[in-house]
From Swiss-Prot:
Source species: Yarrowia lipolytica (strain CLIB 122 / E 150) (Yeast)
CDD domains for this protein: RRM_SLT11 (cd12265)
Disulfide bridge positions per record: none
Quaternary assembly: Associated with the spliceosome.
Protein name: Pre-mRNA-splicing factor SLT11
GO biological process: mRNA processing; RNA splicing
InterPro entries to which the protein is assigned, alphabetical: Cwc2/Slt11 (IPR039171), Nucleotide-bd_a/b_plait_sf (IPR012677), RBD_domain_sf (IPR035979), RRM_dom (IPR000504), Slt11_RRM (IPR034356), STL11/RBM22-like_N (IPR048995)
């Protein structure tokens, strides 16, 4: 009986017993219970049906025993061909995304890796053909298991390997564990939560959170205003335009959206007093964002993204406690909208030119 092309493809469907998964996806527990589903899904790379493994890893952090359920997304053949994890599709050696790894190897190696690859082809039949040919090569020469001839990882020169190591060290903390023989190191931005909170508390204690625009400070050297309640959709140019129109020339404007606050420094004390006088009760509304404004000298608003984020959470919590939260926090504080500037009436659309 003559076999058809569909029968040949079915013969090459993958049925494996053990997946190729990185240590990050496996979790901290060396004893993992997995479920196996034969031909459970199509491979994300070659589109052939393959054996799907599912498991629930345990997290290494304290206070949380289990992570989210994981499964294999690519077949073992494509995993060997790309030298990547079947679950997260990161490089098994360096923990890098495949696009970054291949781009780094292409820069270091002359000529790149010729021939067809799964990433360069979009046709389903071509992908299956490439996977089948590579599978035959694996059967003929088991050395290809460690020598990745398609991506060139196994044949990378020392310069390319050095570049990959540098990229792996520069990637986020979860990829540093791929470096063998190194201890668990955390970057500066991933410090202990208690130490981070203590540092941010010191920063927040120096900010004029309880201040206002009145009275005017006696110190004539203060020419800056502190504002908080900044949301992500409030651009810096809107803030700059407002203070330029109400005050005058600005010498420095610092807006940290992650910390939900910022400073504006005027060139003269008179310009700062003029801008403060245009703000009623220390409250200002720009693009629907309710800001709190106060006199204050420029201070540090966090030297890292973690510090700025933590400071922003403290500021949002303070604003909610005072009933002056932004419009993104729901209905709280809607009845505390800032009154209009002195001398300007409120115009409603239904009243035409009538002023109240």
């Amino acid at each position: 009986m003559q076999t058809t092309k569909s029968d040949t493809n079915k013969i090459t469907w993958e049925d494996t017993e053990v997946p190729a998964v990185c240590t990050q996806c496996l979790g901290a527990n060396p004893y993992i219970r997995m479920t196996k589903e034969k031909y459970g899904a199509e491979c994300k790379m070659c589109t052939r049906p393959f054996t799907v493994f599912r498991w629930q890893p345990e997290r290494a952090q304290k206070g949380s025993s289990r992570g989210k359920p994981l499964k294999t997304n690519v077949c073992l053949t494509c995993s060997r061909q790309k030298n990547c994890c079947q679950s997260c599709s990161l490089d098994l050696t360096y923990g890098l995304p495949l696009a970054i790894r291949d781009a780094a190897l292409k820069m270091e190696q002359e000529g790149g890796g010729g021939g067809l690859s799964l990433s360069s082809s979009s046709n389903t039949i071509t992908k299956q053909f490439i996977a089948q040919n590579y599978e035959e090569q694996l059967k003929q020469d088991q050395r290809l298991l460690t020598d990745n001839s398609v991506t060139g990882t196994g044949k990378a020169q020392s310069a390319a390997k050095g570049l990959l190591k540098q990229l792996a060290n520069a990637m986020p903390y979860r990829k540093e564990l791929y470096e063998k023989g190194q201890k668990d190191k955390r970057p500066a931005d991933s410090r202990d939560s208690k130490a981070l909170t203590a540092d941010v508390t010191k920063i927040a204690s120096k900010l004029p959170l309880t201040g206002s625009t009145t009275p005017v400070p006696k110190d004539a050297s203060i020419k800056s205003l502190f504002f908080m309640g900044v949301e992500d959709d409030l651009p810096e140019h809107v803030i700059r335009k407002h203070f330029t129109e109400t005050g005058g020339t600005i010498s420095l404007l610092t807006v940290v959206h992650r910390a939900h606050c910022g400073y504006v420094v005027f060139e003269t004390r008179a310009a700062a007093e003029k801008a403060a006088a245009a703000i009623s009760g220390g409250r200002l509304v720009l693009n629907g964002c309710r800001l709190r404004v106060a006199w204050g000298k420029p201070r540090n608003l966090g030297s890292s993204s973690d510090e700025q984020w933590k400071l922003g959470q403290m500021i949002k919590k303070y604003l909610r406690s005072k009933g002056g939260s932004s419009n993104k926090d729901g209905a709280a504080g809607r009845d505390e909208a800032a009154p209009p500037p002195p001398g300007q009436g409120i115009k409603y659309q239904s009243q035409g030119n009538i002023e109240l």
